[in-house]
């Protein structure tokens, strides 16, 4: 029986692991991909993490992974299938969690720190995408494929604008197509000052299809159906929470984010939530790290009382 099982090896999960190790808890950290460091690895540039002037998301996440490895913490690669809370009614423990994995194995733990984060939304959720259309989620990973070519990014948030700036140094032209700009004003200013980036705002993407070797984007702008053609396409329309593995009793928002307070406590005793999966106003690397630390501390306090 473990003290806690940490599900997720992004910044929130790894932060929880650091604090769990320092508290001498008996725990495991589980990740679907042991070599991944979560959504942060797709960030082209992180400039708002205290103490670090500028770093790629992958390098930031990897430095944290190196830190936990130096502490002797090993990420175990497994995919969660289900989590069940079980009433024990023994002298030693009154309740515990059974975590079942797709490989048929199970873990039993007094608590769970759920930090599985979110995954990219697909463009098929907002428009018609033909089967032969290929697009990307990561500019830093796939941007070099389009050196000197024309690319487009669908999305209006910080990710879209940051990746546009990165792609502007590789591609010939970059077009941002969005129904609403929600990126920070500093990013918007940088994009507007970059000559080979254009922004098509208040546009509704209707369909994506191929003609010869090009990707065609049909969109509605001011009630007029327009068309643009590019060599490469990137998606930055947000993410959806991976909350479908948690116990059915756990309260969630309408969008599927788990309801938890600043200590990570949910409506289920012993079940804690950290990182992007938690309903909150700000989802950043720094808030994910804080969530993980708070959850590990909450586990320590919970175990003292149980």
Where are each of the predicted segments found?
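FAD-site-proximal beta/loop scaffold in flavoenzymes
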Residues: 130-145, 237-287, 291-301
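Glycine-rich FAD pyrophosphate-binding loop
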Residues: 5, 22-41, 176-184
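Internal hydrophobic alpha-helix adjacent to the cofactor/substrate pocket in enzyme cavities
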Residues: 165, 169-172, 176-179, 286-306
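N-terminal Rossmann-like FAD-binding beta1-loop-alpha1 element of flavoenzymes
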Residues: 3-28, 163-164
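N-terminal Rossmann-like dinucleotide/flavin-binding domain of flavoprotein oxidoreductases
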Residues: 38-106, 181-201
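FAD-binding core/adjacent interface of flavoenzyme oxidoreductases
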Residues: 1-7, 23, 35, 42, ...
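Predominantly flavin-linked oxidoreductase catalytic cores and closely associated redox partners
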Residues: 90-94, 105-204, 208-213
